[in-house]
C-alpha cells in the first residue's frame, strides 16, 4: 500500500483555539466539501509558523464561517493567525493508481477566503512514467497557479496610490504581476 495526499487546505489561518473542548479541529463544512474532507476524518496538520505537526479528526463548524479552530490538546500547538496545511490522505494499491487520483487543494487568503482551487495531476510524460503538475481547477491550466497568499492586495493598492500612482497604473501593475 502507498499513502498519498487526497485533499489539502493550504495556508488556512487559525481563527481560534479551545483547550477545553474534546479534541479535533473545527472547520467550515463548505470549505471541507470543496476540498473533499469529511467529518470525523483524520487529517495531518502542519503549522507553518511553529513547525508543529499533529494528527487529529475533523468536525464541522458553522457553514460560511471560514473557521479553523484547534481543540483539546491540539490547541497547544498553535496561535490565532498561524498558517496551517491540513492534509487528508488515502491508501492506494500501487503507483499506477496515481493516474486516476486528482487531489483537490484549496489555497487561502489571510482572511480564510478561498483563493484558488487546484488539483494535483500525475501523468506520463516523455521524460518519466510518473510526472507531476499542479493545475488550476477552474481554468485547467498550470500557468494560473500562484504562490503569493500573504500579499495584501488592498494594502498594496493603498501604498501605490500613496506614492501617486493612478488607478489605471495600479490596475495595470496588479494585472501584470498577479493572476487573480
Swiss-Prot record:
GO process terms (BP): alanine biosynthetic process; pantothenate biosynthetic process
Spell out the protein name for this chain.
Answer: Aspartate 1-decarboxylase
* Family membership: Belongs to the PanD family.
Q: Name one GO cellular component term.
A: cytosol
Q: Which residues carry this modification: Pyruvic acid (Ser)?
A: 24
| Keywords carried by this UniProt record | Autocatalytic cleavage, Cytoplasm, Decarboxylase, Lyase, Pantothenate biosynthesis, Pyruvate, Schiff base, Zymogen
The protein's matches in Pfam families, at most eight in alphabetical order, are given as: Asp_decarbox
Q: Is this entry keyworded Lyase?
A: yes
Q: In which pathway does it act?
A: Cofactor biosynthesis; (R)-pantothenate biosynthesis; beta-alanine from L-aspartate: step 1/1
Compartment(s) of residence: Cytoplasm
Question: Can you name one GO molecular function term for this protein?
Answer: aspartate 1-decarboxylase activity
- Give the Gene3D superfamilies listed for this entry: 2.40.40.20
Q: Where is the active site?
A: 24, 57
For this chain, the Swiss-Prot or TrEMBL PTM comment says: Is synthesized initially as an inactive proenzyme, which is activated by self-cleavage at a specific serine bond to produce a beta-subunit with a hydroxyl group at its C-terminus and an alpha-subunit with a pyruvoyl group at its N-terminus.
Q: Briefly state the protein's biological role.
A: Catalyzes the pyruvoyl-dependent decarboxylation of aspartate to produce beta-alanine.
| Residue sites binding substrate per the record | 56, 72-74
The kind of enzyme this is, by top-level EC class, is lyase
> What EC numbers are recorded for this enzyme?
4.1.1.11
Subunit text: Heterooctamer of four alpha and four beta subunits.
| Superkingdom of source | Bacteria
- Signal peptide as annotated in the record: none
The answer, when asked if tRNA processing is one of the entry's keywords, is: no
Amino acid at each position: 500500500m502507498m499513502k498519498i495526499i487526497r485533499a489539502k487546505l493550504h495556508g488556512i489561518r487559525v481563527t481560534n483555539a479551545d483547550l477545553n473542548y474534546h479534541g479535533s479541529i473545527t472547520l467550515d463544512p463548505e470549505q471541507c466539501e470543496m476540498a473533499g474532507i469529511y467529518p470525523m476524518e483524520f487529517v495531518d496538520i502542519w503549522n507553518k509558523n511553529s513547525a508543529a505537526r499533529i494528527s487529529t479528526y475533523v468536525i464541522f463548524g458553522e457553514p460560511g464561517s471560514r473557521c479553523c479552530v484547534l481543540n483539546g490538546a491540539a490547541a497547544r500547538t498553535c496561535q490565532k493567525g498561524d498558517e496551517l496545511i491540513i492534509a487528508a490522505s488515502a491508501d492506494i494499491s500501487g503507483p499506477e493508481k496515481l493516474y486516476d487520483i486528482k487531489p483537490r487543494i484549496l489555497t487561502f487568503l489571510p482572511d480564510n477566503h478561498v483563493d484558488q482551487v487546484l488539483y494535483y495531476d500525475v501523468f506520463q510524460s516523455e521524460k518519466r512514467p510518473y510526472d507531476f503538475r499542479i493545475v488550476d481547477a477552474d481554468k485547467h491550466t498550470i500557468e494560473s497557479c500562484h504562490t503569493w497568499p500573504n500579499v495584501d492586495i488592498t494594502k498594496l493598492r493603498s501604498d501605490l496610490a500613496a506614492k501617486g500612482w493612478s488607478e489605471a497604473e495600479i490596475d495595470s501593475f496588479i494585472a501584470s504581476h498577479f493572476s487573480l
